[in-house]
Structures are given as C-alpha cells and as structure tokens.
Amino acid sequence: MPKNKDINTILVIGSGPIIIGQAAEFDYAGTQACLALKEEGYKVILVNSNPATIMTDKEIADKVYIEPLTHDFIARIIRKEQPDALLPTLGGQTGLNMAIQLHDSGVLESNNVQLLGTKLSSIQQAEDRELFRSLMNELDVPVPESDIVNTVEQAFAFKEQVGYPLIVRPAFTMGGTGGGICHNDEELKEVVTNGLHYSPATQCLIEKSIAGFKEIEYEVMRDKNDNAIVVCNMENIDPVGIHTGDSVVVAPSQTLTDVEYQMLRDVSLKVIRALGIEGGCNVQLALDPHSMNYYIIEVNPRVSRSSALASKATGYPIAKLAAKIAVGLTLDEMLNPVTGTSYAAFEPALDYVISKIPRFPFDKFEKGERVLGTQMKATGEVMAIGRTYEESLLKAIRSLEYGVHHLGLPNGESYDLDYIKERILQQDDERLFFIGEAIRRGTTLEEIHEMTQIDYFFLNKFQHIIDIEHELKDHKGDIEYLKYAKDYGFSDKVIAHRFDMTEDEVNQLRKTNDIKPVYKMVDTCAAEFESSTPYYYGTYERDNESVVTDKEKVIVLGSGPIRIGQGVEFDYATVHAVWAIQNAGYEAIIVNNNPETVSTDFSISDKLYFEPLTVEDVMNIIDLEQPKGVVVQFGGQTAINLAEKLAEKGVQILGTSLENLNRAEDRKEFEALLNKIDVPQPKGKTATSPEEALENAREIGYPVVVRPSYVLGGRAMEIVYNDAELGNYIREAVKASPEHPVLVDRYLTGKEIEVDAICDGDTVIIPGIMEHIERAGVHSGDSIAVYPPQTLSEEDIKTLESYTTKLAKGLDIIGLINIQFVLAHDGVYVLEVNPRSSRTVPFLSKITNIPMAQLAMRAILGEKLSDLGYQPGLQPYTEGVFVKAPVFSFNKLKNVDITLGPEMKSTGEVMGKDLTLEKALFKGLTASGVEVKDHGTVLITVSDKDKDEMVKVAKRLNEVGYKILATEGTAQKLADNHIPVETVGKIGGEDDLLTRIQNGEVQIVINTMTKGKTIERDGFQIRRASVENGVPCLTSLDTANALTNVIESMSFTMKQM
C-alpha cells in the first residue's frame, strides 16, 4: 500500500517537559518519527515546549516551535501553518490529550487537518474506561470486576459490593497520576478525590484488586491492512499492583509456558485489531500464576515508555515504523532497518535477556513516601543485556548509581532480620536489595514468595547469585570459580570482596588467565538473518562480534539514567558531541545504559555499547577498542566521576585535564587560583569534623550555606541560620570527616547569574549570560532563568565577561565550562564553577544558534574557535526574551516538601519566548503547568522576615483585582497597610485554609518557609495541599513578583480618579 500522497505537511506534537511518568523516551520517539517522515518526503512542523531535547533541534523538523502545549497555542500554530495532518501518538499522554481537545473544539475540522495513525474513536475507546470495558465484554476478553465513577459516593457504593482492596485508575492520565490502591475508607476517599481531580474527564475506574497476579506486557504493531506483530513481550518481576514504570522488568518473559505465551499473544493481537490501532501499542495483562485465568489491565494506544524499552531491547525501531504506518505504509513493504534484508513484518527474536530497573529520586527526597503502588514514582530507568537472567540483573543493578553494586545494600549486614522482612513487606524501591539480604540470612524462598508473590523462577535466580557468593568465599582466588562468577554477571569489585583481594588484584588475575568479555551484537533476529547493527553488549563467552576498525576512535561516556539534577540535557550534549566527532573524521563510540534516550539509538553513533558506566565495564571496552581518548565532560557527574580512575589506568581524558577538573572541585586549590586571577568568592572554609564546622560558621557569620564537596544537583545542601540548625544538619545530613569534608560558605543574598562558555585553550567565547529570577540560594536548576539579562548594568556584564574569561583560562578549560555568580550589593562573586557541560547548554544553543556542545567537542579535538569564525568574549544577543522555567513532579511524590532551596527538586524544564519579558514569562509559566489567570483568589502566608516585601506584592495583586486571603499574622500586616484582606483560620481551626484550598477556592498560594523543618509544620501541609489540589504554590517572593508582573501585563489597572 503506497504512502498517503494527499498530504504534504504534518504537525507533530511533542510531550513537553520531563516529569515522572513521561521522560526522555518521548524525545527518542519524537526524534525518530520526525526523521522518518522527512525521509518519506513530508514537510514536518514540530511543536514542543521542552528546549532540552534533540527533537527540538532545527535539523530534526522543517519548522520547530518551542511553545506551550496548550490548546490555544497549538491552535494558533495550526491557523498560521495550515498543516494537512496531525500526528498525535508520539507525544505521550500530553500529545493524545491535545489531539482530543483540538478535535472536540472543532479546530482540526475548521482548518481541514486530518489525524494520522490510530483513529480518534480508537484512542477514546482505549483511554475511556467505560468504552474500553464494554468493548472487552463484546470480545469476551475478561477485565477485572470494576465500575466507572464520577463521584466519591459512587466509589463507596461499588466498595459495598466487592470489598477491599480496590485499585483506582483515573481516565486519560499517564504514569498512574492520581491513582492508587485502597485498603480502607479513608484511603478510598483520598485517592478517588485526587483521581477525579487529575482526570480531564473527571472519571475513574475502580476495580477489584488482582494484586499478586503476574503482570505481562506485549508491545505490538499493526498497520491499516491488518498486519499485526508482537515486537516484544515483557514480564514484570513485581506482580500486579506496582506500576509497570516502577517495576523491575525482564524481556522476553521468563516464566510463561508456551501455551500461556501464545494465549496472551493472541489476546493482545485480537484487542488491537478490534480497536483498529495503526502504529505502536502497548497491552498490559494480568495472569493468575495458579491457573490459565487472565485479565486485560489496559491498552496504551500510543508509543510509550515500554515501547522505548522494547525498541532498545530488540533493536526494532517502533516509533520510526509507527510514523511510517501513520502515513499509510505497511509492515510487509518496509524493510527492518536493523537487518536491512528482512521485512518489518518479521517478529523480532532475542537470544539474550534484558533487565530494566527503575531509577527513583529518593536519594534526593529522603522523607518522600517510598512505598510503591499504581502511581509511578521513578524518574528514569536503566537497562542491561546479558546471556543469563543473573548477568543482566547484576549489570542493571550496577548501572543505577546508588552506590549499590550487587544484590544487597552497602551496609546490609547491620540490619536485623525482622527489619529486613518488614521492608520486604512494605514493597518500596529497595525491596529487591532487601530480598537479597534476606536470602543471605537463610530466609526460605517459600517465606519470601509468601511475602512478595514474586515467581519462584526469579527467587531461585536470586538464590543462585547468593550461592555463587558463598562459593567464592569458600574458594578464594580459584580461577574456575572466578570464571563462573563472571559468567553470571559478578563485577570484579564484588568478587574482590569475597576473595579478600583488591579490585585491581582481581582484575589482574582475570587478565593473566585471559578471562575477558566479548561483545555480542543486538540484531533483532537471534542471528537468523544477516545483520550488521553496530549495537553491542558485553558477556563472558567465546566469539567476539564487535569488529575493531583501524580508524582513530573517540569514546563518549553517556550520563546514565534520568534523575533529578541530571536530566535529558546531558543526553543532548552527548549526541551533539558524537556528531562533531564523526564530522571530524573519527569513529564515534557511545557507552550508555539508559533505554529511553536518543544517544542509545544505534543509528546515532558508529558503535553503541549498552553497558554499565563503571570503571570495570568501560575499561573492558577501552582495552578492546584502543581509542585516541575518552570524553567525560558531556555525561554529567556520572562521567566526570569515572575520570580519575580511568586516568590512573592510563586512559587519555580528552578536553579539560583531570588535574584541572580536580582544581575546580578542590577547595584549597580553587581558592588559590581565584586569588591569583583576582576573582572574588564568598568567604568560606572547609570542615573535617562537626566541631570545626561550628567554629567556621561562627567565624564567617550566619547565615551560611553548608554542603558536601563533589556533588551534583545540590544534594544535601542547606542554608542554616544558627548553631542549632547547623548541628542538626551535621548530625542528620552529612557526617563530616577527613574523607568527606563539608564546605561552609557565607550565604550572600543577591541576584544569581549563570554563564556558559567554551574555551579552546586560547579563545573564550560566551554564548550568553542568564539572569535568575529567584535570588541566590535557590538551586539554579529550580530557578527561572532569563536571557538576555534584564536588570544588569553594562558594567556588571563587562565584569561577568572578564571573570568568565579569567576562570576559563585560569583552569585551562578545553571544552565547556558553566559558572554561577551572585551579584551582591558590593559586586560580583563567583559561587561555583563546573568544568563540564551543564543543563543550560541546550537552552542557550537553541536561542543563539551556537551549537555549543559541537563547538566544545571540536575544541577538544584540537580545532581553534578563531578559525571557526568566532570572536572572543560575549557573543551578540539574539532578539527577543527567552525564559527557562522549571517543572516539578510533586504530585507523584508524597511527603516531599516543595520549598525551593539549594537542593534541586525539578524533573524537567520548559522554554517561553516572546518579544517582552512578561509575555515570555507568561508562556514559560503556562508551559510549566501554572495557569496564569487575570483575576482570582490568592492565599498568602509568609514568614516574618518576608512580610515587608510581601506587602508590595499583595498591593499589586489587589490592584489588578485579586482577592486576598491570609492567615492571622500576615492578614494583620496587610490590613495595617490598607490592603483589603480576608482572614482564614489556621490549620485545624474553623474555616481553615486547607479546606479553602481543597474546595478549589484558591488559584494561587504564596507561602515562604518558617524555620524549623519538622514535617508537621503548618507550612508543609499548606504546600502539600496546594500540590495535591493542583494549585500553583510559590515558595519564593521573587517568583511571586514575576507572576505579578505577568498578571499586570495581561490586565488593566483599576484606580479611582
């Protein structure tokens, strides 16, 4: 069937910012789809609000709009561009919901835009719980006993019929937003209220819990001629009841009999045929472990997180082929790009095992609610490939970067068995490691199965891993046992611990006895057809399939799983670095382990090694490939942390030298440099004991910022105002010691400024300077950044330019450098220098059209910036105003305080651009999910130190027509300043403010921290109530000021004559 010739221009909707439940997998899918449509000769227009993606690069689509993903903005683009068609199934839930809104409002019809891919009626049939259930009944496919509710009362009526436990699933949401498992009336009321709030259709499905069934997924493709195939099937190790995005997953499934596999395969294909899916689709099923009974849980009629995993697990490019199916091509006429010889209608076959483990943000949010359920909490994931289940699991564990290298916890032996069992029953993010610990203590597999319902197949594999540990201990230094442990994925580090040797000794022993990994190709067909994909995984077997060429090579280390503080921005830089290496005539090799990203698409680099980012795994690749060198500055802290160990082993670190990377991090050396080049920094000291920290703080004068050295994303960083708070910090957050010094700095209040620069050793170019809206003290990743600066004087800009140039040259930077400054009342101070790519690189690259990561890579390979046509210093400004606004995922993380501070909390970002600051901010705030209204009610409750400043904001909000509610102290202050205000009761009193928030009477909350960070504090409850009821809550008066500017610019002031 030839492609659709009636259309020329296609609008693609992206998925917007990275949030929990919708991460980098959509950048990967969108990039693939846009390129596939261009390959077929269509003109592609892309709209997405996320500047950190490869997808929003000008090369990917013919026209790129970085605008808010709201009905109004997309409708404007449709009216302006007049596309022939819209492809909505590649932008996650956001893209789907937008398509439905644009259709319902008549925008598509009135502009003659047709929807490509799966028809809207099919999308609604899959997403609307009522329609889906009735279709399943017609097909005679069992669904769990359930009811559709639009009110809490209806939910209680259903509970009377079936009893607890119940699962609540809101319609048209993703990542299980607003859903959950309920065991009692209190939970049912809370979850249903939440779920109805988050569902665009105010509709929830309530079903009898089938927790404990096996959860199986099929990733399927269908075209318009009804050809349908299964690309990959996957099994969740955790039974039904934990969101698949939070489950440990294995592919292909390991515990199904052939009869069960075929039965569920047939059901999956029957369902997508009945729905009329055209493209990729994910089907989730529950199978009773004790019979052939099964239920269908849900169908995602779009490309999803699971399809990114299936693509990387098989090499079969689902999003690319889904885009081509959408324009009318069929599976039997498209070649599989991996083999180049077989057609896309052949189902992939795997001769290896894939393990996926989610990456959770609880290293950042220690007080967060860790228990897992149907609402997703992971920010990212890792994948590993092995020849046995044990090998792939252990490789995935050491890819997580939790400081865990094996099936157990770092200080596992210190826990007593009762505590371990309690944690296993709790089913949280560390359960897997506690299971390992329990087996180590001799707990029977029967007892663990009883507690977890995890299949014996997997429990036996865990037991096998523990058995190998015992064998190693009993046969220290034995080569046969060493080889056996390597076959099952043990790292040298773990073997060393059992052998009572150092890691280097085990490494040496291995090499002397020629025990080293070979690299196998991922070819989609288990070697049934000829294939030549440059996509490899390491394993301890015989034949090496990775042919080493005689071209000069450069290895780029990726940034691993998406987490808070290290997002898709680093993947963006990695991909650009690879393109620059290829353009310079070298062979570019990527090592990474994140299945969601563009960098792990095998068509990007000359070779892709899907391996853990550890010294051992990376060294094995270096030993084989013998590269010119390794690039670490694009992979975030993950790659930087490997630099020292690699250099010790004689590896050439390309770009800024290891010595200079360390100079930027080492307190004393950095201070010496600043004195030499005459750049001021806030007074600070290093403490190696709690006593010394107190002494330092008193000498410098409070408030001080305290933090451990060598961290990314401001982990464990705090501003403290007195001895008691400092003592508390040192006891709870960081044990200060000679190995782990704590930095104590004077906290300067002032405007924070961020600068990115590129240096080739001689010339320093500064693509742009960004000014933060929130004053210093809020982490740069959580601040709203503005380009070009709006309030800096010419003199300030000259100083920033001069300091940046001095720092880049003083540190002998080759490549990128990111610097944060504070402009205090008495001048500019340097706060922090990062000698690597930063999270603002994609944002600045897009604004200025300076391909920063590529230029940095060219400088690293020895080219001169002056030869490339760049003048030194600050580059000319781009016209317009651009803001980068943070996006948070607090609605998915219970018990997490949303107050902004030095520790980063946002999961993603959006960009707003326009001709004035107010318009750009309006777009940035809108894109980040803050609905800016020109009237409404604002609730203000601030700490004493903020009251004077708050009066000014309240006065302006009142003048544009906002009604003001405030708690007693704040209300008194406002009344004293003649501002109309209504006093609301404190929490727990009559007419309390939480009730006002829950009843939807409040549109904005302004709440600043009162010291004494106990969770019970009222402020915490106010902030959480805001998040859980979808009300924007501003915890910084700077943000409140900016929002007030925007509201003023939208409305007219009303003043009497």
UniProtKB/Swiss-Prot annotation:
Residues 133-327, 671-861 form the ATP-grasp domain. Mg(2+) 1 binds at residues 284, 298. Mg(2+) 3 binds at residues 820, 832. Residues 547-929 are annotated as: Carbamoyl phosphate synthetic domain. Mn(2+) 1 binds at residues 284, 298. Mn(2+) 3 binds at residues 820, 832. Mg(2+) 2 binds at residues 298, 300. It is an enzyme of class 6 (ligase). Residues 930-1057 form the MGS-like domain. Pfam families: CPSase_L_D2, CPSase_L_D3, MGS. The keyword Amino-acid biosynthesis applies. Mg(2+) 4 binds at residues 832, 834. Pathway: Amino-acid biosynthesis; L-arginine biosynthesis; carbamoyl phosphate from bicarbonate: step 1/1; Pyrimidine metabolism; UMP biosynthesis via de novo pathway; (S)-dihydroorotate from bicarbonate: step 1/3. Mn(2+) 2 binds at residues 298, 300. InterPro entries: ATP-grasp, ATP_grasp_subdomain_1, CarbamoylP_synth_lsu, CarbamoylP_synth_lsu_oligo, CarbamoylP_synth_lsu_oligo_sf, CbamoylP_synth_lsu-like_ATP-bd, CbamoylP_synth_lsu_CPSase_dom, MGS-like_dom. GO terms for cellular component: cytoplasm. This is Carbamoyl phosphate synthase large chain.
